Every structure is written in structure tokens, then in C-alpha cells.
Amino acid sequence: MAGSYGETFDGKILDDLSGAWVEKHNWSDILRRLTKIKFALQADRDMIPGIVEDLSTEIPVDENTRFPSGKVYHLLTKEMLMAIEAIHAASSFKRRAEEKNNVNPRQRFEAESSSSQLPSGGLVVRPAAGSGDSSLGEDLFSNSKLDDASTAFHKSLATLKGSRPKAVVQRTFEKEYSLRWTAAAPVAAAGGTPPGGRSWTWNLV
């Protein structure tokens, strides 16, 4: 229904509308999908940015648009926004070895074979320990970083699931910000009968 909040749409409401408002079902869906993530799997980590992008943080309200009837919204706190950012950041982790050796198993086998030499005596001579990168060292470093990223992800997700953002509906929203919605006056069609009025016919002699 057309109308306006008029002069009541001022003050604190203007500041709060710039915050992150999330519709209840959208919020529940995001939490459900994040909960299903198996962080140890790269394929699952790659899904996280898309999930976060599906979070809609705008509320369709302005001076001439009333808070949606029948909808429930949450205003996310600073702590919740930081947790979401931490989850997004953690998803960018990739194992160093996977990035460096982004080749198929056959290529990796051939590369490892070429690092060995077989002299006439049949003795295999391998590169001295410490010459070049250490695969074991890289794996340990990578696993340590994965643990850090996994901890950040699960801790932040626990923060979001444990939060209890206030549920806001049309009535509580308008009460909170002292808003008064005034419906626009109906416009009578030309030559028609105004709502609630009478139709008069004048006979001119």
C-alpha cells in the first residue's frame, strides 16, 4: 500500500539502516550451509565464499517503503560481522604443496624420478638433505596453517550459531524508531465516485 513515514523517518533510523539487516530465513539458510562444511576438504573450503555472498544484508525500507509485513529481520552486531569476515578469510587457505605442485600424479612421479641419479654401480644418489625445499617441512608447515585456519573457521561459526540477534517485525520496528506510517489518500478516477461518497446527477433545465 502506498504511503509514507513522513517526518518521523529521521534520526536514529537513518544510522541503523546503514547496518547489516538479514532476513530470518536467509540467515538460517547461511548457517545451515556453513555448518555442513568439512573444512579439511579443499572443495568444501572453496564453497564458503559463495555461501557468504548469498547473505543479503539490506532491508527494503525507506521513507516511502514500509517495513515488510509478515517478515522477520535481524540486525547483525559488529561481533557477528567480524565472525563472518573471519570465516571468509579462513576459506582462502590452500595447502602450499598443492599450490606449488598443481600437477597430476604422473607429472609429479616423473619430477620426483628425475631428482634421482643412477650411476653405473647401481647406487641411487639423492640430493643432500637440506638442498632445496623439504617436503616434510612443507607438509608440517602446511598442516599447522590448516589447523589455524580450521580453528578460526569453527570458532567464528560457533560465535554465529551462539548469537541471538533480536528478531524485528513491522510492529516492533516502527515502535523502536517511533515511526508512523500514513497511507496515501486514494485518488478517485475522473468522473467516478470518490470512496465513501455519493454520486450526484444534476439535471439542468
Curated annotation (Swiss-Prot):
Main location: virion
Pfam families, sorted: TMV_coat
Gene3D superfamilies: Tobacco mosaic virus-like, coat protein
Region (Disordered): 98-130
SUPFAM superfamilies in alphabetical order: TMV-like viral coat proteins
Protein location: Virion
Protein biosynthesis is among the record's keywords: no
Keywords (A to Z) from UniProt: Capsid protein, Virion
Residues in the signal sequence: none
Gene Ontology cellular component annotations, sorted alphabetically: viral capsid
Biased composition (Basic and acidic residues): 98-111
GO molecular function: structural molecule activity
InterPro entries, alphabetized: TMV-like_coat (IPR001337), TMV-like_coat_sf (IPR036417)
Keyword GTP-binding: no
Name of the protein in question: Coat protein
Species assigned in the record: Tobacco rattle virus (strain TCM)
